[in-house]
A protein has these predicted regions:
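Ribonuclease/tRNase effector modules and their secretory precursors
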Residues: 2-153
Length: 153
């Protein structure tokens, strides 16, 4: 796909656009931006508010941040997709996830976007609550696991 600058250099016969610097690339894909630590912190705050109703605190590993921006995902995983994943999983499986108890492992699978998030539940003695530790995230069709899968469309 041509960028705004490439398109205009080829179609404009006046002053070359190489001398003018556009403020923004209007044709750039919106989903190409990498997710920052701050973005992930905001997603975590949102997920914490959702899952607080069932006594779960959401945490992300450092590997999660690395993997969310990994090239192997082919299409960049967006903040909106992560928020959707937490919202839909809570709506459909919130109480069921809380009943798994400590030391349980499972995968949340969004079949619409093919985003998979393996997680572990750990008991937090300090706060007396379950921690949902999101270990990693990846975009992959037909994700195979031996752990329980919580799927939604």
């Amino acid at each position: 796909m041509k960028t705004f600058k490439q398109f205009n250099e080829q179609s404009y016969s006046g002053t070359p656009f190489g001398t003018i610097h556009p403020m923004a690339d209007l044709n750039a894909a919106a989903g190409d931006a990498k997710i920052s630590k701050q973005d992930l912190d905001n997603v975590e705050k949102y997920a914490d508010r959702l899952y607080k109703a069932v006594g779960i605190d959401v945490e992300f590993t450092r590997h999660f941040l690395d993997r969310v921006n990994d090239e192997r995902n082919k299409k960049q995983i967006t903040v909106a997709e992560l928020i959707r994943m937490f919202k839909q999983s809570f709506k459909k499986y919130g109480k069921k996830i809380a009943q798994l108890g400590p030391d349980a492992e499972a995968v949340i699978n969004d079949m619409q976007t093919d985003v998979n998030m393996p997680f572990a539940l750990r008991w937090d003695n300090k706060n007396q609550e379950l921690d949902l530790v999101a270990k990693t995230v990846m975009r992959k069709k037909n994700f195979a696991t031996s752990n329980q899968k919580f799927q939604f469309k």
